[in-house]
Structures are given as structure tokens and as C-alpha cells.
Swiss-Prot record:
It holds the Pfam family GCV_T. PANTHER family: AMINOMETHYLTRANSFERASE (PTHR43757), AMINOMETHYLTRANSFERASE, MITOCHONDRIAL (PTHR43757:SF2). InterPro entries: GCS_T, GCS_T_bac, GCST_C, GCV_T_N, GcvT/YgfZ/DmdA, GcvT/YgfZ_C, TrmE/GcvT_dom1. The glycine cleavage system catalyzes the degradation of glycine. This is Aminomethyltransferase. The lineage of its organism: Bacteria, Pseudomonadati, Pseudomonadota, Gammaproteobacteria, Lysobacterales. GO terms for molecular function: aminomethyltransferase activity; transaminase activity. GO terms for biological process: glycine decarboxylation via glycine cleavage system. Belongs to the GcvT family. The gene is gcvT.
Length: 368
């Protein structure tokens, strides 16, 4: 049976087109996906991301567990509230999921994982946690909102009690804190996001969600669907699990080598394979593409390079650039001239560094 967030009726009342996303009925847009995209780049938008899975980890051995479980190093997390992006790998070095981990106390960490991977993530984490006597708690009592855009932080802080505003305004990137709502319920506010814009992601009790959503809409924040969330994240150069990487792809093959820490004394799952890949290189790579001709890059399209064939992973029309952009996985090596097969035509594309857009600004290499 399809799942619904606490805001399902609210989305429908706002005219949202609802679709099935990983077993959840979610808004794809509220009228115009392109208008929603531009509003986040220029102002502030709010996303219902309550389909994401929140997992709390409790116990004196949580940090040793995470040193084993994650390819990035939780030893970086020393200040309560600090967050880290990491891949969780299988023994073959493939990506089980990408996630954000928060350090709350030495005996208390928090994961935010993808909706599509909920069941396998929980099974894998529980299996690994048993050896460390760590309690794994799924927080189904919490909803999650993302408020993103250049005006997002101001719109959120203006709704908070004055006693909390200063701390929230000073919150650094990839950091979180807990504050009390006007009804004395706890809001977990994190300066993170999936759009390439500044803003907050907020975990809050289910029963508080509609009130906060409506309060933000009254300030001029617009509701944004998952369609614009996808074009925003692709412009920002952010991977989508299941499309840009999966259990057959290592971080080095998904342009996520920067998330791998081969620090001494930490034998994380999949490390041996990644060490070999680091030494010997990988046979395939993920690259960014931009197409100057009219048309759209789509998942699965064949990509032709001097080294051989690959395929488009994520592809879309970029509202900010007014051109088609995408990620492709192709054979390793300098791609040189690249073409994409679209309806039996070989269309030239340019290889560009990503992100394509950061905080509303086209990156300087895009139109070189």
C-alpha cells in the first residue's frame, strides 16, 4: 500500500500533481516545475521530504560502529550537531546508500537515509550494529521539511522565538541544533540541503508539521515539488542514489572519491577494494555533460567517447542554464570529443566540471 506523509491533504489542496516516489505519494509539482525551480534559486521554497528515513543510533560503541560502517571518517565529528556526508559500502566497495550522519552525543548519532533504500539500510545497519551493542531506532514519529533558497534562512529564523534566533542565524554549514517551537516541541534544524542553495532541513514531530508549513507559506515561501528538487540537485552536481550510483558502483566511479577517507587504523567495510582502486585506478568514471543543441539528455541514452561507450545517468533540461545537462558514466580516460545518441542521431556534447550551478550562479567553466 502506498504511503502518505502528514501533508498529503495539504498538497492536494494546493493543487499538487501527486506521483508514486519509492512507494510514497508525493507532489511532483504544484503547477509549473520550472517556476518552482526559479523560485528556489531566487527566493525561497519549501519541500516536503518526510519520505526520507531518520535513524537514531544509541550506545557507547556508536562511534566504533560508524568507523566500520562508513567510508568517510566520523572522527571528523567532534562538536555536537556537526554533520558529515558519507557512503555506506558493501564488501565489494559498492554503494549501499549515501547518507548524512549527525553527531549529537558520544552515545547518540543520527542518520538521514534515502526513502528507496529504507528496508535494506535498516537491515544492514542492524546486522552491523549487533556486534557493537548499538540500539538502532527508526524515527517514524518525525516529519522533515526542507526550506531552500537565498531567502530561506531568514524566513525560518523570523518564525522562531527571539531566544533562538541568534543561535540559528549563526549555525554553520553542515551543522544542526535543537530549538523549541512555540508549542514547546523540539525542532531539529540543520543547515543542509539538496539544491545547491543555502537553507535548512527541519525535523519535527508529525503533529507540528502542518502548522509550520502553513506559517512558512504565509511569509511568501512557495511549495516546491520533487520535479524541481531533481533539476535543482542536478544543477548543483549532487548524486541521486539508484540512478547515479548503486551497489555495483564504487564512490570512485561516482565522482564521490572526496567522501572516502583512507585514514590509518580504520578498517571500514569495502576499504580493501577502494584501496586497490585508489592505487590502480578505475575502469569507468562519472562526468558532467552540457548540450548546446536543443533537446534533453535522458537516463539510459548511449554516450560515445574515444575510449568506448557509456550512458547517461541523470539528465534534464536546466532552467538556470537554459540547456540540457547530465551525468554520464563512461570508460576512464580523457573523454575528448563526446557524442550522445538521441533518436539515432549522434549529438555533440561538452564535458564540463560540476556543479553546473552553485547558489544561483553559473559556474565559470560552463560556457568556456
Amino acid at each position: 500500500m502506498i504511503k502518505k506523509t502528514i501533508l498529503n491533504d495539504t498538497h492536494r489542496a494546493l493543487g499538487a500533481k501527486m506521483v508514486d516516489f519509492s512507494g510514497w505519494e508525493m507532489p511532483i509539482h504544484y503547477g509549473s516545475q520550472i517556476d518552482e525551480h526559479h523560485h528556489v534559486r531566487r527566493n525561497a521554497g519549501i519541500f516536503d521530504v518526510s519520505h526520507m528515513t531518520v535513524i537514531d543510533l544509541h550506545g557507547t560503541q556508536v562511534r566504533p560502529l560508524l568507523r566500520r560502517l562508513l567510508a568517510n571518517s566520523v572522527d571528523k565529528l567532534k562538536v555536537p550537531g556537526k554533520a558529515l556526508y558519507s557512503c555506506m559500502l558493501n564488501p565489494q566497495g559498492g554503494v549501499i546508500d549515501d547518507l548524512i550522519v549527525y553527531y549529537l552525543r558520544e552515545d547518540y548519532f543520527r542518520f538521514i537515509v534515502n526513502a528507496a533504500t529504507r528496508e535494506k539500510d535498516l537491515a544492514w545497519i542492524n546486522t552491523q550494529a549487533s556486534a557493537f551493542n548499538v540500539r538502532v531506532e527508526e524515527r517514524a514519529d518525525l516529519a522533515m521539511l526542507a526550506v531552500q533558497g537565498p531567502a530561506a534562512r531568514a524566513q525560518v529564523t523570523n518564525l522562531l522565538a527571539e531566544t533562538h534566533r541568534d543561535a540559528v542565524e549563526k549555525l554553520g554549514r553542515f551543522a544542526a541544533l535543537e530549538v523549541a517551537s512555540h508549542s514547546k516541541k523540539i525542532l531539529f534544524i540543520s543547515r543542509t540541503g539538496y539544491t545547491g542553495e543555502d537553507g535548512f532541513e527541519i525535523l519535527l514531530p508529525q503533529e507540528e508539521t502542518i502548522t509550520l508549513w502553513n506559517a512558512l507559506l504565509k511569509t511568501g515561501v512557495k511549495p516546491i515539488g520533487l520535479g524541481a528538487r531533481d533539476t535543482l540537485r542536478l544543477e548543483a552536481g549532487m548524486n541521486l542514489y539508484g540512478q547515479d550510483m548503486d551497489e555495483q558502483v564504487s564512490p570512485y566511479e561516482a565522482a564521490l572519491g572526496w567522501t572516502v577517507m583512507l585514514d590509518e587504523g580504520r578498517n571500514f567495510i569495502g576499504r580493501n577494494v577502494l584501496e586497490q582502486q585508489k592505487t590502480n585506478g578505475v575502469s569507468r568514471q562519472m562526468i558532467g555533460l552540457l548540450m548546446d543543441e536543443k533537446g534533453v539528455l535522458r537516463h539510459g541514452q548511449k554516450v560515445l567517447t574515444a575510449q568506448g561507450e557509456g550512458h547517461i545517468l541523470s539528465g534534464t533540461f536546466s532552467p538556470t542554464l537554459n540547456k540540457a545537462i547530465g551525468f554520464a558514466r563512461v570508460p576512464a580516460g580523457k573523454p575528448s570529443e563526446v557524442r550522445v545518441n538521441i533518436r539515432d542521431r549522434e549529438i555533440p556534447v561538452r564535458v564540463v566540471r560540476f556543479p553546473f550551478v552553485r547558489e544561483g550562479q553559473t559556474q565559470p567553466n560552463i560556457f568556456d
